[in-house]
Amino acid sequence: MIQEQTMLNVADNSGARRVMCIKVLGGSHRRYAGVGDIIKITIKEAIPRGKVKKGDVLKAVVVRTKKGVRRPDGSVVRFDGNACVLLNNNSEQPIGTRIFGPVTRELRSEKFMKIISLAPEVL
């Protein structure tokens, strides 16, 4: 469950380290985002010579949450932290070329197959 002001880790090599959610996209009064949802973020911490810099406003897809995601069989997949992958504002394709850490099977839609293929592990 990601809401406005939530700090997230970045699970790719775009150059950002920490980001903050500034808007949950999809509906005018939508409050929370889960795994697979697109959010608007601003970069709070970045490494030198990265593809993005501090203060940039981008879109991101949530790939891991502490709240977890419930499967139809009743199991819940939870993680130790909240993480996202940065997306290009226009094409909504990943900015980074590598993904760090596992991602969930819920990302297997037409839009995020690139993230699934880059991820080292799909749970």
UniProtKB/Swiss-Prot annotation:
UniProt GO MF annotations: large ribosomal subunit rRNA binding; structural constituent of ribosome
UniProt cross-references to InterPro entries, sorted A to Z: Ribosomal_uL14, Ribosomal_uL14_bac-type, Ribosomal_uL14_CS, Ribosomal_uL14_sf
Keywords: Ribonucleoprotein, Ribosomal protein, RNA-binding, rRNA-binding
SMART domains in the cross-refs: Ribosomal_L14
Gene Ontology biological process terms in this record: translation
PROSITE patterns: RIBOSOMAL_L14
Gene Ontology cellular-component annotations: cytosolic large ribosomal subunit
Task performed by this protein: Binds to 23S rRNA. Forms part of two intersubunit bridges in the 70S ribosome.
The protein's assembly and partners: Part of the 50S ribosomal subunit. Forms a cluster with proteins L3 and L19. In the 70S ribosome, L14 and L19 interact and together make contacts with the 16S rRNA in bridges B5 and B8.
Family, per entry: Belongs to the universal ribosomal protein uL14 family.
PANTHER family hit by this protein: 50S/60S RIBOSOMAL PROTEIN L14/L23, LARGE RIBOSOMAL SUBUNIT PROTEIN UL14M
Protein name: Large ribosomal subunit protein uL14
Species annotation: Cronobacter sakazakii (strain ATCC BAA-894)
Lineage summary: Bacteria, Pseudomonadati, Pseudomonadota, Gammaproteobacteria, Enterobacterales
